[in-house]
Amino acid sequence: MNPLVIKLGGVLLESDDAMKRLFEALVDYQKFYKRHVSVIHGGGRLIDNLMNKLSLPVKKKNGLRITPSEHINIITGALAGTANKTLLAWALKYNINAIGLCLADGGSIDVERLDENLGHVGKAIPGSPLFLKKLFKEGAIPIISSIGITKDGLLMNVNADLAATALATTLQANLILLSDISSILDGKGQRITEIDSIQAEKLIMQGIITNGMIVKVRAALEAARVLRRPVDIASWQNTEKLKLLFNGVNIGTRVYV
């Protein structure tokens, strides 16, 4: 069975209830299945709250956070520090063998600067799977923040959905984009169970898919194209359904090329 990459986002990182549900589902899943699992996360809301406390501006362009050089150390601390180690702490609380990493560790994901106008925002490029495969052999779950490092040693903030796509490509894994959003919704607010690139672009043009969801959907489409398999967008909110999701059942929106 292919490895599984679970991307965490939304309010999950700030909710004890969400953490409890997620890690209970992972523990139960690992009791019955030997599939290798890797977790990757961002922490946009955590960063927004921190920036507001520091009276620093929060600016985005096409759903991507503008990250000037004076902000990258703060964002690195929030993502690779607070967010990553909070997830690691929850894993240890549930006796899960986990290790906290960033994209650069083991050369797992290469990163280049995406756009000078965005500052320290990186483009994730699939790297080497060898380090992560060694961790899998030891029975560990890598928990990876979306902070990367360029070849010339610059810290980069990478959109976590796009980082997850690169990670899934590196591992030839199935990908789940997990957040507080249960699925993509149509113009009437109803769940879309399956969507392809033509349908997605139509909903974007109509203004039904907007803002950060555009990045999420396009990341899922790119992952589906590269991996040649569908990608799931789903919510963490139902523990029982999470177990089904980890085993390949569609509980949200399944994205096809």
Curated annotation (Swiss-Prot):
Pathway: Amino-acid biosynthesis; L-arginine biosynthesis; N(2)-acetyl-L-ornithine from L-glutamate: step 2/4. The record marks 7, 216 as: Transition state stabilizer. Its main location: cytoplasm. Keywords: Amino-acid biosynthesis, Arginine biosynthesis, ATP-binding, Cytoplasm, Kinase, Nucleotide-binding, Transferase. GO terms for cellular component: cytoplasm. Substrate binds at residues 43-44, 65, 157. It catalyses: N-acetyl-L-glutamate + ATP = N-acetyl-L-glutamyl 5-phosphate + ADP. GO terms for biological process: arginine biosynthetic process via ornithine; L-arginine biosynthetic process. It is found in: Cytoplasm. Catalyzes the ATP-dependent phosphorylation of N-acetyl-L-glutamate. This is Acetylglutamate kinase. It comes from Buchnera aphidicola subsp. Acyrthosiphon pisum (strain Tuc7). The lineage of its organism: Bacteria, Pseudomonadati, Pseudomonadota, Gammaproteobacteria, Enterobacterales.
